[in-house]
A protein has these predicted regions:
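Short low-complexity, flexible loop/linker segments enriched in glycine and/or proline
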Residues: 47, 121-122, 143-145
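Conserved glycine-rich acetyl-CoA-binding loop
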Residues: 77-91, 100, 104, 110-118, ...
Length: 152
């Protein structure tokens, strides 16, 4: 893995403002700078970015224990969606987690996010539970689907 100006790599402190901008452009609840700094500094967390022409155009974040990992967000900038970059970001992250010997990978997604659900199922994530009224979008409660993948 690299932290160069192109492709997949570690996020650094200078990337945080772009990450927050990507979140806010996508109408996601934004976490603050300290949250992302903790992901970078904590050895049991990760924050990887996808760069294009030296700019951060997407990111994936998670927390892990010895054998388990929770992917807490994967977001591609709105203007770069549909280019396969989410797939690239996820596949690179799964390779890193495999190298770390992470066995179980969990994530949750809003039940109405069909593009994300298709992506996760394409990579072998299996639906294991539904969390009723988990997300709130524009005063509407949305269920979350909990997924698990066994990384072999």
């Amino acid at each position: 893995m690299n932290d160069s100006s192109e492709g997949f790599g570690f996020a650094n402190q200078d990337d945080i403002e772009n990450i927050i901008k990507i979140m806010s452009n996508g109408y996601y609840k934004c976490w603050d700078r300290e949250f992302f700094l903790d992901l970078i500094k904590n050895r049991n967390s990760f924050l990887y970015v996808q760069r294009k022409e030296k700019s951060v155009i997407g990111f994936i974040a998670g927390k892990r224990s010895e054998e388990d990992c929770d992917i807490i967000m994967l977001i591609i900038d709105i203007k770069n969606r549909g280019e396969g970059l989410g797939s690239l970001l996820l596949s690179n992250t799964l390779l890193v987690l495999k190298d770390m010997r992470v066995k179980n990978i969990y994530l949750e997604v809003a039940v109405n996010n069909s593009s994300a659900i298709s992506l996760y199922e394409k990579y072998g994530f299996k639906k294991i539970n539904i969390r009723k009224s988990y997300y709130k979008f524009n005063k509407t409660m949305i269920d979350a689907v909990l997924y698990r993948m066994v990384n072999s």
